[in-house]
């Protein structure tokens, strides 16, 4: 193809993604679009086709973004090339959404005709507006008995401020309105800008590791053209590689002769080292490099930290390799090595939220077959010392001595909770119990209320979401953003087993709740730890002060049972032997206690 043909082809390209709150029908709509454009044969079609991970299918959520190419013949008789980038809906995967949107010019905003606008709908719309995307509202599930499309249309206009007069009324499940959506994409989503004759600039928006071909980059070509045989260069580190294959996903990988401006596809270049590529980096040609890198992505800072340890210590290197491969595919995951007296060698990992942490743990166990122990989640505290230093602490075991601490600041988030009016009282009570400060409350319509609180992140990462769902019978939707750091009365609580501190069980708690939390954990540990042949005291301590204690009574073994009579010195000898054995056991009894159960206890305490 010459330059003129490529420019004509570029005018026919439409790059778009689908954004929505969880369960508003995003993946189902993607399935219907694939069917309508005959991208996938009816034999290969299955529900949630783009959710290729088993975990995504089981949980019914999208975790990873997916990009596929479709061809659509519009009513004007022209054939258009669509690049559909499917995105997750959960707050923990906002980073995936922002990466998808950076590769698009338009976004289909799916809103449930019965539930209306939810907290995550708003968060995703603001991301799309930040990227200057053309937003096409779609009111989905109009075939539900509780559907009220007109009310939702007004909500879209009043709450988001988008013109919803031309919003498509659709039912992805029943296949209603799909053609109308495709026609709107053709008419309203702009073709990609960019110059096919300019030096190559390709944005890496995702990557995946292949055992045979190395790292495979998923890219959006912003300027220029790339083809097999080209020598490409990473603009962040200057590393060069020879392109072996380029292609697109349909959703299977299909090789192509080239990828040109506006295309979304993959590039394989025998990249063997995971560290050589970074999501958000710019790829250019080594012999004709671009003058500057593309804007890339804002680096996401982890909000929740936890220790990950292999149950078998010889799996430490396997765990490191597994984390590196997951990080390639999930740039928001961060990790560094750490050691624990109780658990040995492992990693301190940073996550965007609890669901993100849960998904990473499950992927490590399933995809890499490593049995893990996770410590209780923690957040980043700012500890100000008496010598006027500020230390960032994400691991309770790194907390300085209490005598050196002047004051501690903890992260607060702005929590936006959308809830039916009848549950407002329950939401406010829960938020206040979690040390939240009320900010404001708006009525979206006659029945639904948007409540905003400032809540400590540490309270949210434990059980806030579960408690919110149970206190509102599942009707509340929730979204949060980092707000600020505030001074708080925080203390480090240590758990002592048989007089020894167990570093993996330490946690940070507000002074007000210290006694209550300490008592709960001590009682739980008493039930979990098996009885020994000696008494084991379990204590919760703040510094030198013991705030809660419980004892596991000794298990008595009668070593004299086999002595029916005989000399007393024989009996004394057996008792002395038992006493020596008990003393020897005291040193390493913890190694045999169920460490996974201990950590689950501290996690749920």
From Swiss-Prot:
One of its GO terms (molecular function) is translation elongation factor activity. GO terms for cellular component: plasma membrane. It is a peripheral membrane protein. GTP binds at residues 23-28, 140-143. It is an enzyme of class 3 (hydrolase). PROSITE patterns: G_TR_1, G_TR_2. It is found in: Cell membrane. InterPro entries: EF-4, EFG_II, EFG_III/V, EFG_V-like, EFTu-like_2, G_TR_CS, LepA_C_sf, LepA_CTD. Residues 11-193 form the tr-type G domain. GO terms for biological process: positive regulation of translation. HAMAP family: LepA. This is Elongation factor 4. It comes from Streptococcus pyogenes serotype M4 (strain MGAS10750).
């Amino acid at each position: 193809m010459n330059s003129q043909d490529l420019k004509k082809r570029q005018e026919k390209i439409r790059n778009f993604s689908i954004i929505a709150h969880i369960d508003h029908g995003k993946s189902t709509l993607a399935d219907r679009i694939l069917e309508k454009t005959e991208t996938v044969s009816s034999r290969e079609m299955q529900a949630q086709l783009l959710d290729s991970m088993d975990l995504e299918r089981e949980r019914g959520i999208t975790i990873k973004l997916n990009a596929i190419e479709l061809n659509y013949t519009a009513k004007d008789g022209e054939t258009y090339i669509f690049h559909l980038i499917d995105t997750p809906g959960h707050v923990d995967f906002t980073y995936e959404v922002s990466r998808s949107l950076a590769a698009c010019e338009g976004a289909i905003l799916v809103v449930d005709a019965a539930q209306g606008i939810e907290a995550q709908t708003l968060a995703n719309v603001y991301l799309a507006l930040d990227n200057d995307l053309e937003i096409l509202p779609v009111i989905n599930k109009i075939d539900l008995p509780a559907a009220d499309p007109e009310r939702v249309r007004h909500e879209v206009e009043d709450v988001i401020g988008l013109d919803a007069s031309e919003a498509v009324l659709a039912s992805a499940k029943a296949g209603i309105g799909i053609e109308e959506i495709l026609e709107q994409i053709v008419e309203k989503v702009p073709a990609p800008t960019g110059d096919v004759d300019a030096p190559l600039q390709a944005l890496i928006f995702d990557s995946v590791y292949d055992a045979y071909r190395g790292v495979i980059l998923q890219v959006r070509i912003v300027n220029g053209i790339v083809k097999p045989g080209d020598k490409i260069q990473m603009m962040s580190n200057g590393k060069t590689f020879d392109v072996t294959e380029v292609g697109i996903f349909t959703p299977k990988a299909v090789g192509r002769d080239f990828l040109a401006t506006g295309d979304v596809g993959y590039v394989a270049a025998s990249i063997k080292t995971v560290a050589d590529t970074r999501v958000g980096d710019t790829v250019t040609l080594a012999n004709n490099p671009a003058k500057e890198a593309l804007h890339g992505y804002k680096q996401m800072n982890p909000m929740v930290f936890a220790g990950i340890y292999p149950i078998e210590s010889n799996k430490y290197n396997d765990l490191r390799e597994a984390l590196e491969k997951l990080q390639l595919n999930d740039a928001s995951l961060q990790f560094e090595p750490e050691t624990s007296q109780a658990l040995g060698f492992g990693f301190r990992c940073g996550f965007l939220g609890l669901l993100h942490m849960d998904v990473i743990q499950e992927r490590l166990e399933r995809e890499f077959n490593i049995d893990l122990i996770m410590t209780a989640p923690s957040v980043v505290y700012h500890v100000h010392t008496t010598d006027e230093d500020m230390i960032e602490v994400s691991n309770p075991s790194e907390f300085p001595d209490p005598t050196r601490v002047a004051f501690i600041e903890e992260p607060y988030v702005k929590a936006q909770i959308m809830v039916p009016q009848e549950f407002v009282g329950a939401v406010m009570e829960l938020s206040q119990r979690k040390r939240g400060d009320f900010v404001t409350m708006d009525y979206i319509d006659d029945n639904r209320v948007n409540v905003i609180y400032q809540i400590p992140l540490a309270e949210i990462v434990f059980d806030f979401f579960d408690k919110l769902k149970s206190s509102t019978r599942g009707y509340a939707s929730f979204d949060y953003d980092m707000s600020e750091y505030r001074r708080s009365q925080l203390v480090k609580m240590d758990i002592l087993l048989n007089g020894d501190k167990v570093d993996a069980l330490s946690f940070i708690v507000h002074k007000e709740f210290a006694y209550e939390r300490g008592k709960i954990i001590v009682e739980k540990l008493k039930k979990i730890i098996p009885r020994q042949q000696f008494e084991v005291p379990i204590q919760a301590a703040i510094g030198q002060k013991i705030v809660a204690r419980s004892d596991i009574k000794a298990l008595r073994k009668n070593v004299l049972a086999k002595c029916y009579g005989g000399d007393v010195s024989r009996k004394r000898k057996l008792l002395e032997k038992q006493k020596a054995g008990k003393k020897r056991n005291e040193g390493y009894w913890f190694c045999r206690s169920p460490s996974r159960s201990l950590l689950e206890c501290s996690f749920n305490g």
